[in-house]
């Protein structure tokens, strides 16, 4: 899935190696144990923000594994991630729609429940994450702004 706009891609393609490059991120367990690739979608949004020089909203949090097709996949430990976001002062959390069953349990015990100061939104794909997180110029949607291949 290539989401980089043509003008930015042209700048990046001025590198050698037949104008081909890719980004591969490996997050080994190391000193801090991790339970799966929960940061995949957040890392993808951060890289796109950096490469395209589009700022992100700093009042949001995001979790979800990202597939090679740009789908946001379910993760473990959603309850602690939502609780952590709320405790950190986050206003809006995005999480995989495939974790909807987990979110229903969380919504039963969130105190106070979701309101203008805190909400959780389920997402299916990277475009929904980009639409929520990035301050995309010209009031365009991610689908309009980013080049699809």
Where are these predicted regions, by residue range?
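Peripheral, non-AAA+ core regions of ATP-driven protein-machinery
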Residues: 1-149
